[in-house]
Regions:
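C-terminal motif of bacterial Sec signal peptides marking the signal peptidase cleavage site
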Residues: 22-25
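Divalent-metal (often Zn2+) His-rich catalytic cores of metallo-beta-lactamase-fold enzymes
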Residues: 36-48, 52, 306, 316, ...
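Feature captures hydrophobic
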Residues: 28, 475-481, 488, 492, ...
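Metallo-beta-lactamase
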Residues: 121, 145-147, 153-155, 170, 214-288, 333-345, ...
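Active-site metal-binding motif and surrounding structural segment of the metallo-beta-lactamase
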Residues: 144-145, 155-206, 270
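Conserved beta-strand hairpin/beta-sheet module of binuclear metal-dependent hydrolase folds
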Residues: 112-172, 296-311
């Protein structure tokens, strides 16, 4: 029986499939940095000066917009049912005054702007709650209650935002919910806004763009473990909140980590343009799929002379490629939607978005949209031009800069996305990973190459000496390249690890992009402390996983089969969901797992009958072999041994793999 229990313990293979849905990280309290040299080298200060050249960081217009309509600010913390802190409103109180030497002044300005948190009036009958999460929660007053636009990441912060709003605006019911797009920071807290039972009982309309549920539950399921691990770097979830660590994400302060759920839409907007009346108020929706998200719309509220740009518009250059990992976004399509939106905002006196602060006044609204439209289009067109001239992605990224009319405009600065990695994204979109150089067609794996480079350079001591010279000269990119090879050739080389960590410190402190800063500083932290001890707490995802089709989990299951151990096996397993009244046939052949929704196969090696809730408990590691055999919620017909053998083939990915070492 020991073998069978081992197999079923491995059935928690999917415990990390949705890790990426939380945007990354599992630490509710940030790690403290190890003692490190606090020397900010002159090259970093020079980089700060260069990034601010020609830019008026003292321009008061954005600060006036960020403060406009302020009603009240929250204090204290938001906790979960167990008393764990989900959100601390005072965590970024240190962001004030002049920029410290360890933060790019331009990024510090963005962090100051994002520090304006609380309840704000956008227009008559429209309010926003900012700083309760990385995204905004918007309230639009209908005839009888509040229509909620986006619901943050976590149930706890969404509930806190609603309670705070009601204290100041009155205890009105939720009469509609709008999800602008399929990223979790805009829907994950929905059950903190209104319960599924209340929404159903009162027939509250829940509006979302076409394809919303599939995109919301699928983008991160297959690659969720890898995305979640990488997102720890991008969002700096392990970093301390201080001037040497996390100061901002570029889009907002940070990501809230609590219970994530989903309120299933009752109305899908599937036309290019579609009008709806919600609680007596007219909305005009425009679908923009494949802009910032695969499923997304923007909308106007004509009666309020207001337009919501969702996340297609923001006060930063956004990502065409997100560093946590995802499919590349289409710059040409995104720019095209922004061009169309110039007509959609006709008559609007305010544009509000689901990150950052609004823009008021028709001339400023047009400028806001035009600059973003042209930034994405310029990056696209110039990357294609240089690509057709024979340049590779890295070469284009090194050469490409925005024209000064765009570069000096603060709302398309690279606080989140950057021109450099967006140019590489455009190259990848059209050309993929191969740059056409024969030497790059089948290169040596990185660790093998690293060992040979170190040997070629004269050994570890010689490489370390060269890296010190590069570091002292302020050539931190070259120092990082040398030290990457040295650390990958020998992860136990403490001197190399520390110098690489110090190099990443300098690169992070220099960066204008918050994700770049977070990536570098998390790399430095992990060189000193190692990877996290555990991945995402999966139980927080149960409410979301309930809405994920079984097929999504089976796709992830197929991708977790260890091909080497599966070779030569031929197994058929029936999965019967008694509560869903559906069954799936899984067949393993040629070390490939296929699955079909079909009646149980008569010749199956085993049939496992269970309920969806118990299946989810298995996936999240809350149930194992003992519960499978004794819970009374399952039945096994056929070979128990074959069923255990099948589950033993599935790799468990805890989401704590090393990134800066091997």
């Amino acid at each position: 029986m020991a073998r069978q229990q081992h197999g079923w313990r491995r059935a928690t293979w999917a415990a990390g499939v949705a890790a990426g849905l939380l945007l990354g990280g599992c630490s509710r309290q940030p790690s403290s940095t190890a003692a490190a040299p606090d020397d900010v080298l002159p090259s970093v200060r020079q980089g700060h000066a260069e990034s601010a050249q020609g830019v008026d960081l003292s321009d008061p217009a954005s600060f006036a917009d960020a403060k406009r309509g302020f009603i009240a600010a929250p204090t204290g913390t938001v906790k979960d049912d167990a008393g764990q802190v989900i959100w601390d409103f005072d965590a970024f109180a240190f962001v004030k005054g002049a920029a410290p030497a360890t933060v790019n002044p331009s990024l510090w300005r963005q962090a100051l702007l994002n520090n304006h948190v609380g309840l704000f009036k956008v227009a008559d009958g429209i309010w926003q709650l900012r700083g309760f999460d990385i995204a905004n929660l918007t309230l639009i007053e209908g005839k009888t209650g509040f229509i909620v636009v986006d619901a943050l990441t976590a149930r706890e912060t969404a509930a806190a935002a609603m309670a705070f709003a009601r204290r100041h605006l009155g205890d009105k019911p939720v009469t509609g919910v709008i999800f602008t797009h399929s990223h979790v920071d805009h829907f994950g807290g929905a059950l903190g806004v209104i319960s599924a039972e209340e929404a159903q009982a009162r027939q509250v309309p829940v509006v979302a763009p076409a394809g919303f549920v599939d995109e919301a539950t699928s983008e991160n399921v297959l690659m969720g473990t890898a995305m979640g691990r990488r997102a720890m770097y991008m969002y700096g979830s392990r970093l301390p909140r201080d001037a040497r660590g996390l100061v901002d994400t570029g889009l907002g302060k940070a990501v809230a980590f609590g219970r994530v759920g989903l309120l299933k839409p009752t109305v899908l907007v599937d036309g290019a343009r579609q009008e709806l009346t919600l609680d007596g108020l007219r909305f005009v929706f425009h679908n923009v799929p494949g802009s910032e998200a695969p499923s997304e719309f923007v909308f106007s509220v004509p009666e309020r002379r207001a337009f919501c740009g969702a996340e297609m518009m923001s006060h930063t250059l956004h990502n065409l490629y997100t560093l946590r990992g995802a499919k590349v976004r289409d710059a040409l399509k995104w720019s095209g939607y922004l061009d169309q939106s110039l007509a959609w905002v006709d008559g609007a006196e305010v544009v509000f978005n689901q990150h950052h602060w609004p823009v008021w006044g028709a001339p400023r609204i047009r400028d806001f949209i035009v600059k973003q439209r042209d930034a994405y289009r310029y990056i696209h067109d110039q990357t294609v031009r240089l690509m057709n001239a024979g340049l590779t992605g890295p070469e284009i990224a090194e050469q490409l800069t925005l024209p000064r009319s765009l570069r000096d405009w603060l709302n398309v600065r690279g606080y989140y996305g950057t021109v450099r990695h967006n140019a590489k994204a455009v190259y990848q979109h059209y050309m993929g990973w191969y740059d056409a150089h024969p030497a790059n067609l089948d290169p040596l794996p990185p660790v093998d190459a690293a060992r040979r480079y170190v040997e070629l350079a004269g050994g570890a001591d010689r490489v370390l000496s060269l890296a010190h010279q590069a570091f002292d000269a302020g050539e931190h990119r070259w120092a990082a390249e040398l030290l990457k090879h040295l650390v990958w050739s020998d992860a136990k080389n403490a001197a190399a690890r520390e110098l690489l960590a110090r190099t990443f410190d300098q690169l992070g402190w220099r960066a204008e992009s918050a994700p770049w800063r977070n990536v570098y500083l998390t790399g430095a932290l992990e060189l000193r402390q190692g990877p996290p001890a555990q991945g995402l707490p999966k139980e927080a995802l149960l409410e979301l996983l309930q809405h994920t089709p079984v097929e999504r989990f089976l796709e992830a299951m197929a991708a977790s089969v260890d091909g080497g151990r599966a070779e030569g096996l031929n197994l058929t397993i029936n999965l019967v969901f008694s509560d869903l009244k559906e069954s799936h046939v899984l067949h393993l052949e040629n070390a490939v797992l296929h699955h079909h929704r079909a009646p149980p196969a008569a010749d199956a090696n085993a049939t496992l009958t269970l309920t969806q809730p118990f299946f989810l408990r298995l996936l999240t590691g809350q149930a194992g072999a003992k519960e499978l055999l004794t819970s009374g919620q399952t039945r096994i017909d056929g070979s128990t041994i074959d069923l255990a053998r099948f589950f033993a083939l599935l790799d468990k990915a805890p989401g704590t793999f090393p990134i800066v070492t091997r």
